[in-house]
């Protein structure tokens, strides 16, 4: 593929301005940010209408939206549950379903899961449940669209050095927790965003043309030992 235009769906106009500038700098002028909350089906419709009008088709879809709210059993609220499930599971279901009419044979879908689907930490039960759900969506969906030529796979990262990971921990405990997480990795370090991007790029590429319905765990082996 000689040229790749990238559309980034982003929740919130201010985030579009910030992420959009960074994406254009890193990826190039073919990048565009469009406001879209994946839990809002009308905003998804607007997103895909804009893509159809300008590009007519989607070759690669990466369903990356997701977040967590830490809460132990006994303190989980309905509001927390609904917000996590609306984004992490409902959002993914309709992100993919509404994209399918724009995808042709040879296209690829990559769902971003998490090793929390198999090893959720304390206070991560709701988040872990949504990520386990993604794994089973992929298993079922490849049967639903059998013969379409569209592949669906999952990339499940472990801890990755991003701002969202740093913000997840209290300031006075952050370095200690990150050091502990690093010891869990059998390659001696935490993941970098580039590690996940390379895994996604592989599963979306023609090199993975005979790979369908798998979960590729990218965590330095931490969940395997």
Please describe what each predicted stretch is:
Residues 36-46, 78, 194-195:
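The beta1-alpha1 cofactor-binding region of Rossmann-like NAD(H)/NADP(H)-dependent oxidoreductases
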Residues 135, 152, 157-167:
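Short, flexible catalytic-loop segment of classical short-chain dehydrogenase/reductase
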Residues 72-73, 77-85, 181:
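Substrate-binding pocket helix/loop in short-chain dehydrogenase/reductase
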Residues 101-102, 143-147, 209:
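Alpha-helical segment proximal to the catalytic Tyr-Lys
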Residues 114:
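Residue(s) in the substrate-gating loop at a strand-loop-helix junction
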């Amino acid at each position: 593929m000689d040229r790749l235009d990238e559309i980034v769906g982003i929740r919130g106009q201010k985030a579009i301005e910030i992420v959009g500038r960074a994406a254009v700098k890193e990826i190039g002028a073919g990048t565009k940010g469009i406001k879209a909350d994946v839990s809002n089906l009308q905003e998804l419709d607007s997103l895909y209408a804009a893509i159809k009008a300008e590009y007519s088709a989607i070759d690669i879809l990466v369903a990356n939206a997701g977040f967590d709210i830490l809460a132990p059993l006994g303190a989980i609220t309905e509001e927390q549950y609904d917000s996590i499930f609306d984004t992490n599971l409902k959002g993914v279901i309709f992100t993919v379903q509404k994209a399918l009419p724009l995808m042709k044979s040879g296209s690829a879908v990559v769902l971003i899961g998490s090793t929390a689907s198999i090893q959720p930490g304390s206070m991560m039960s709701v988040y872990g449940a949504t990520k386990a759900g993604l794994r089973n969506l992929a298993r079922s969906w490849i049967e639903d669209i059998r013969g379409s030529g569209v592949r669906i796979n999952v990339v499940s990262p472990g801890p990755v050095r991003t701002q969202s990971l740093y913000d997840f921990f209290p300031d006075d405990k952050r370095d200690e927790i990150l050091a502990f997480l690093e010891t869990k990795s059998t390659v001696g370090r935490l993941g970098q965003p580039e590690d996940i991007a390379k895994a996604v790029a592989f599963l979306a590429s023609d090199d993975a043309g005979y790979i369908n319905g798998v979960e590729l765990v990218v965590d330095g082996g931490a969940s395997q030992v």
